[in-house]
Amino acid sequence: MGSKVSVEESVRVVIVGGGFAGIAAATQLKSFGIPFVLVDLKDAFHHNVAALRASVESGFARKTFISYKDTFQDNFIQGKVVGINLQTQRVILESNEELQFSHLIIATGSNGPFPGKINNVISKDQAIQVYEDLVKEIQKAKHVVVVGGGSAGVEMAAEVKTDYPEKEVTLVHSKVALADVQLQPKVRRTVKEILLSKGVRLILAQKVTNLDQVTSNVAQENTVLQLDKNSEVVTCDLVLCCTGYKISSSSYSSAFGDKLAEDGALIVNDYLQVQGHANVYAVGDCAYINEPKMAYYAGIHARVAATNVRNSLIGKSLKTYKPGALSMLLSMGRNDGVGQFNGCYLGRFFVTMAKSRDIFVSKSWKEMGQTMPR
């Protein structure tokens, strides 16, 4: 992955956040022989790309959580980052422990509703059980409503309808077109065709107005969702929310107040350095870059940032990162999918074989040097 370099004792990279970007940066730095510490709230990496599959298939969740300690040993610290002191170059943890850094990689990702994300500080075993509990709730429900028709929402609706074809599944979306706005129209049309062919009912260009008054992820008969047009209501047994993803900025916002974009992401230059800070990088969802927030891009950012840390230490030119043509694969259940790569349409069979079968979980286990459970 990279040749090892000789560095001074004062060199220490702190990586804040252990999502796709964080583990990619840590793995790259490890291969370079550059000292680092990875900090995360959880004790295990969550392969949240596969969280929706874990919501419908019993036993799958244990494949989506991978121990940090088993991969990074003493280079991992479990803790909550509550502040960053740029003057003293220290990361401050909730426990009052302070981590000295020569370089900082911020990879805090984004927060969003369960089941797409796990935001609570719980153990790997507890997290797995939360998904197993949701599988049971979905199994109990006769009518499931998915709120939000972005990429997560369409995948969620497809997962439920694929594994439980007898259930009524409704998808409510505030816009007319489904999935990510940057996708080719042909991809978005195919997404709609797949959902309709599976029997998913689509309610488009409507918003749920009482979502904050409804309990999500728990089967409850006669749950009523109010829509914003024509006084329409939808009555169901279970609500799954796939909207409202926000940048996780709480750990760094006070340190970089004038370097934040409107959504809380950090403004970076072409080298992924935070504006005005040559030794601080932002990667993944928390970097302000005009492209969809995806694990695929987060990994690329992280490898560029880690390489630039190395290059800065050995006097080489830094690598630049420029968003290219969009690449995105949508898993529409285990047996279907659609997407595009570098702007080119990818057909359903290809995406099914490339992503939909295991949602790349085996790839993450391999990259972290561990054996995936059967």
UniProtKB/Swiss-Prot annotation:
A lipid is attached at G2 (N-myristoyl glycine). It catalyses: ubiquinone-10 + NADH + H(+) = ubiquinol-10 + NAD(+); phylloquinone + NADH + H(+) = phylloquinol + NAD(+); menaquinone-4 + NADH + H(+) = menaquinol-4 + NAD(+); menadione + NADH + H(+) = menadiol + NAD(+). InterPro entries: FAD/NAD-bd_sf (IPR036188), FAD/NAD-binding_dom (IPR023753). The chain crosses the membrane at residues 13-35. Its cofactor is 6-hydroxy-FAD. Coiled coil: none annotated. 6-hydroxy-FAD binds at G17, G18, G19, F20, A21, R53, V81, D285. Keywords: Acetylation, Apoptosis, Cell membrane, Cytoplasm, FAD, Flavoprotein, Lipid droplet, Lipoprotein, Membrane, Mitochondrion, Myristate, Nucleus, Oxidoreductase, Transmembrane, Transmembrane helix, Ubl conjugation. GO terms for biological process: apoptotic process; vitamin K metabolic process. The modification N6-acetyllysine is found at K167. The modification by 4-hydroxy-2-nonenal (HNE) adduction in mitochondria results in loss of the oxidoreductase activity and activation of a novel function in mitochondrial oxidative stress signaling. The record marks H173 as: 4-hydroxy-2-nonenal adduction. GO terms for cellular component: lipid droplet; mitochondrial membrane; nucleus; plasma membrane. Belongs to the FAD-dependent oxidoreductase family. This is Ferroptosis suppressor protein 1. It comes from Xenopus tropicalis.
